[in-house]
Amino acid sequence: MVCIPCIVIPVLLWVYKRFLEPVLYPIISPIISRFWRKTPLQDTPQQKTSTAECNGAANGSTANGPKTVADKKAD
């Protein structure tokens, strides 16, 4: 058995999106846009690049190095 809110909430959301939003959005949108303006993006300063060399190893391991096999649980 499905709980009542699991049925009612999607139906109410569908009614809102289908019927109420087309009527309410043109009224509410100008009011919201006055308070919630988009601010222009600001340029961030360039970060200093690191002078350390990269040898291609991640955490000290290499792709061509020795491979260890994980222990499998014996039944």
UniProtKB/Swiss-Prot annotation:
Pfam family, one: DUF4512
The keyword Transmembrane helix belongs to this UniProt entry's keyword annotation: no
Keywords assigned by UniProt, alphabetized: Endoplasmic reticulum, Lipid droplet
Location relative to the cell: Endoplasmic reticulum; Lipid droplet
Biased composition (Polar residues): 43-65
Keyword Endoplasmic reticulum part of the UniProt annotation: yes
Renumbered residue ranges of the record's region Disordered: 43-75
Region (Necessary for its localzation to the endoplasmic reticulum and lipid droplets): 1-37
One CC-aspect GO term: endoplasmic reticulum
UniProt cross-references to InterPro entries, sorted A to Z: UPF0729_C18orf32-like
Xref: PANTHER family: UPF0729 PROTEIN C18ORF32
Protein's name according to its UniProt entry: UPF0729 protein C18orf32 homolog
Species, as recorded: Danio rerio
